[in-house]
From Swiss-Prot:
<feature type="glycosylation site" description="N-linked (GlcNAc...) asparagine">
    <location>
        <position position="131"/>
    </location>
</feature>
<feature type="topological domain" description="Extracellular">
    <location>
        <begin position="101"/>
        <end position="165"/>
    </location>
</feature>
<dbReference type="GO" id="GO:1903804">
    <property type="term" value="P:glycine import across plasma membrane"/>
</dbReference>
<feature type="transmembrane region" description="Helical; Name=4">
    <location>
        <begin position="166"/>
        <end position="186"/>
    </location>
</feature>
<keyword id="KW-0325">Glycoprotein</keyword>
<feature type="topological domain" description="Cytoplasmic">
    <location>
        <begin position="487"/>
        <end position="504"/>
    </location>
</feature>
<dbReference type="GO" id="GO:0006865">
    <property type="term" value="P:amino acid transport"/>
</dbReference>
<dbReference type="GO" id="GO:0035524">
    <property type="term" value="P:proline transmembrane transport"/>
</dbReference>
<dbReference type="GO" id="GO:0015175">
    <property type="term" value="F:neutral L-amino acid transmembrane transporter activity"/>
</dbReference>
<keyword id="KW-0812">Transmembrane</keyword>
<feature type="topological domain" description="Cytoplasmic">
    <location>
        <begin position="1"/>
        <end position="7"/>
    </location>
</feature>
<feature type="transmembrane region" description="Helical; Name=3">
    <location>
        <begin position="80"/>
        <end position="100"/>
    </location>
</feature>
<dbReference type="GO" id="GO:1904271">
    <property type="term" value="P:L-proline import across plasma membrane"/>
</dbReference>
<feature type="topological domain" description="Extracellular">
    <location>
        <begin position="453"/>
        <end position="465"/>
    </location>
</feature>
<feature type="topological domain" description="Cytoplasmic">
    <location>
        <begin position="64"/>
        <end position="79"/>
    </location>
</feature>
<dbReference type="Pfam" id="PF00209">
    <property type="entry name" value="SNF"/>
</dbReference>
<dbReference type="GO" id="GO:1905647">
    <property type="term" value="P:proline import across plasma membrane"/>
</dbReference>
């Protein structure tokens, strides 16, 4: 007798699992960057439009497929057509790539969390040099937060060609991160269903605390005004629309197979349409909410740096011209500078090269995303807060909850097809399958703990999923609407849920969403081709800053392999199925 499929203990567990998976680090460190780059409040216009015409429909499609087929990604697409098994295989491959490197972020989160209990915070001041005669030269040229990130955390090499060895401290943190994930997925939906209540809700508690604190910080209004002041001319910028569509697409986690896996454990009568709308709205609302928190803190940091810059100029002029202490202030600085320049032109010309150009606008214009925002910009702001240890612990605890929540979805996309397989599950219990997947990912992930590990992390982050996911979701929409048949799928949904599919979903699935995906695919493909030689940012310790370098041939080969290994699964599996069917027909033909 076939074993009954596990189910979520309560529909809320499914919703929380989807929220925990979809609401991730990208909401905190990518969406605020896009707002900053593409017109502040005006970026919300293309973002909301793309949510309606792309995000919600595609999320509903994946949830409906998982709930209808009641299998992981491979089995679900094989049920629709044996020739489409490669879509599920491609999803598993991409999820495997993502799991390899994504948990490294959680390892860094653990590293910073452990160091957050020190007083003072280790990234708040530069260490002394070996002679104890001054500060470390690399740290002085960069900043204390950059030094802690690039030298103490990553111990980064000058280029991707100098790999170095595995570093034991990051390796231990990565092992701990994978142990945490394993404990959360150990019993399948039984354990994951309980964990997601915490991983989904805890980040909101921290964000609310940070919002209250952020709004009371000096200069917070400068950041919020910068965010909410719309630059309407950006609406005519095609890249604003492309990035809005891309952010919606990747933020919801479409194409990985995680959503299909989660939905496969639902009751067939579950209202997945309602849940798709809820999850997509909560995900986008979280991005906007996180941006308000980020920009309030960003405004504090920018104002702090701006005023610090002004104070250094005041000190320089006061000492150079023997002015009375307190005579020169921020309010009369420009007036006094003009007076000194006209009265003492020769002396002022000597001092002028050392006078820094202080600008609040330029501080706010400094756009940073990804690990730079999470581990450098935020820590720069935190170190200047009162009771900085508390805010640091809260912040990195939140990052860990977001990261682990996303990892639960990533691993579900891999594990569900494996546990669905009768061959594999007949030999190994699900605890052993989960353990093997975590162990393999952890072992391969050690590459990212080497001195050149951050460069390999960037390669995986930039190239392992982008084109592959667009192709996967495009084939998914074509498969449902034109292979399985939209009318047939509509009939299935009506039989399952008792609800009729509205014209909106049908138009989006059949026409609008596929055309948008094709447009994104063409954009990214042409962008890669027109870019020419692919480049990366390397840390130069002698200058204390990032420099641009060309990827070496072996790195380009890895990039090509990452893109091809997942995208080629779709045509290769289809071709293999076709050949196998032809051979079966040929073998079963009657002998004359």
């Amino acid at each position: 007798m076939e074993k009954a499929r596990p189910q979520w203990g309560h529909p809320l567990q499914f919703v929380f699992a989807c929220i925990s998976y979809a609401v991730g680090l990208g909401n905190v460190w990518r969406f605020p960057y896009l707002c900053q780059m593409y017109g502040g409040g005006s970026f919300l216009v293309p973002y909301i439009i793309m949510l309606i015409v792309e995000g919600m429909p595609l999320l509903y499609l994946e949830l409906a497929v998982g709930q209808r087929m009641r299998q992981g990604s491979i089995g679900a697409w094989r049920t629709i057509s044996p020739y489409l098994s490669g879509v599920g295989v491609a999803s598993v491959v991409v999820s495997f790539f993502l799991s390899m490197y994504y948990n490294v972020i959680n390892a860094w989160g653990f590293w910073y969390l452990f160091h957050s209990f020190q007083d003072p915070l280790p990234w708040s001041v530069c260490p002394l040099n070996s002679n104890h005669t001054g500060y470390d030269e690399e740290c002085e040229k960069a900043s204390s937060t950059q030094y802690f990130w690039y030298r103490k955390t990553l111990n980064i090499s000058p280029s991707i060609q100098e790999n170095g060895g595995v570093q034991w401290e990051p390796a231990l943190c990565l092992t701990l991160a994978w142990l945490m994930v394993y404990l959360c997925i150990l019993r399948g939906t039984e354990s994951t269903g309980k964990v997601v209540y915490f991983t989904a809700s805890m980040p909101y508690c921290v964000l609310i605390i940070y919002l209250v604190r952020g709004l009371t910080l000096h200069g917070a209004t400068n950041g919020l005004m910068y965010m909410f002041t719309p630059k309407m001319e950006q609406l005519a910028n095609p890249k604003a629309w492309i990035n809005a569509a891309t952010q919606i697409f990747f933020s919801l986690g479409l194409g990985f197979g995680s959503l299909i896996a989660f939905a496969s454990y639902n009751e067939p009568s579950n209202n997945c349409q309602k849940h798709a709308i809820i999850v997509s709205i909560i995900n986008s609302s979280t991005s906007i909410f996180a941006s308000i928190v980020t920009f309030s803190i960003y405004g504090f940091k920018a104002t702090f740096n701006y005023e610090n810059c002004l104070n250094k100029v005041i000190l320089l002029l006061t000492n150079s011209f023997d002015l009375e202490d307190g005579f020169l202030t921020v309010s009369n600085l420009e007036e006094v500078k003009n007076y000194l320049a006209s009265t003492y032109p020769n002396k002022y010309s000597e001092v002028f090269p050392h006078i820094r150009n202080c600008s609040l606008e330029s501080e706010l214009d400094t756009a940073v995303q990804g690990t730079g925002l999470a581990f450098i910009v935020y820590t720069e702001a935190i170190k200047n807060m009162e009771v900085s240890q508390l805010w640091s612990v809260l912040y990195f605890f939140m990052l860990l909850m977001l990261g682990i929540g996303s990892m639960l979805g990533n691993t579900a996309a891999i594990l569900t097809p494996l546990t669905d397989s009768k061959v594999i599950s007949s030999y190994l219990p699900k605890e052993a399958i989960s353990g093997l997947v975590c162990l393999i990912n952890c072992a391969v992930g050690m590459v990212f703990t080497m001195e050149a590990g951050n460069y390999w992390f960037d390669i995986f982050n930039d190239y392992a999923a982008t084109l592959s996911l667009l192709l996967i979701v495009l084939v998914e929409t074509i498969a449902v609407c034109y292979v399985y048949g939209l009318k047939r799928f509509e009939s299935d949904l009506r039989a399952m849920t008792g609800r009729t599919l509205s014209w909106y979903w049908k138009v989006m699935w059949a026409f609008v969403s596929p055309l948008l995906i094709v447009g994104l695919f063409i954009f990214y493909l042409s962008d890669y081709i027109l870019t020419g030689t692919l480049q990366y940012q390397a840390w130069d310790a002698t200058q204390g800053q990032l420099v641009t370098k060309d990827y070496p041939p072996h790195a380009l080969a890895v990039i090509g392999l990452l893109v091809a290994s997942s995208t080629m699964c779709i045509p290769l599996v289809a071709l293999g199925t076709f050949i196998r069917n032809r051979l079966k027909r040929g073998g079963s033909a009657p002998v004359a």
